[in-house]
Amino acid sequence: SAALAGTITLGASLGFQILDKVLGELGKVSRKIAVGVDNESGGSWTALNAYFRSGTTDVILPEFVPNQKALLYSGRKDTGPVATGAVAAFAYYMSNGHTLGVMFSVPFDYNLYSNWWDVKIYSGKRRADQAMYEDMYYGNPYRGDNGWHQKNLGYGLKMKGIMTSAVEAILEIRISR
């Protein structure tokens, strides 16, 4: 069965093959991204919202992500001859009472910018907005450099992730205990 952005899949099956299919669904658009976030946190997540600083999406965030499942999501630049990238943050309320925030940036102009991404856990319930995006983008984000990165997120959780450097980017993240 084909993977579709806006759905969930078995966490163990998340990988570049599935995310490449998500990219393919976006069609012939440059500046696009397929995102997969594997929930190995021991709890469940409920979608709050996505905030696009630039670009848009054609799908909604999967509403509920149980433990050991992975959410699939995507973003793209606006259609037409516009100089935009796919730049956003999205948020999930976690069953531990905190919020998982994810930020990605696939810029239009690679002469000035690079692919960037980050993950952060916020205390309590918090929707994604410009402030959340800026907190992660201007904090200490990871470059989309085709390399794996990991960090302790606090609250007993850690993350490991990778983002490609391409204009058709893939971002794969695993949240675990």
Curated annotation (Swiss-Prot):
Major site of localization recorded for this protein: secreted
GO cellular component, one term: extracellular region
Chain sites annotated for binding phosphocholine: S54, V87, S105, P107, Y133, Y137, Y138
Region: Trp-rich region, which is important for the binding to lipid membrane, residue numbers: 105-120
Entry superkingdom: Eukaryota
Disulphide-bonded residues: none
Record has Phosphoprotein as a keyword: no
GO MF terms, alphabetically ordered: channel activity; toxin activity
Family matches, as PANTHER family: BRYOPORIN (PTHR40388:SF1)
Free-text function comment from the UniProt entry: Pore-forming protein that forms cations-selective hydrophilic pores of around 1 nm and causes cardiac stimulation and cytolysis. Pore formation is a multi-step process that involves specific recognition of membrane sphingomyelin (but neither cholesterol nor phosphatidylcholine) using aromatic rich region and adjacent phosphocholine (POC) binding site, firm binding to the membrane (mainly driven by hydrophobic interactions) accompanied by the transfer of the N-terminal region to the lipid-water interface and finally pore formation after oligomerization of monomers.
Protein name, per record: DELTA-stichotoxin-Hcr4b
Organism: Radianthus crispa
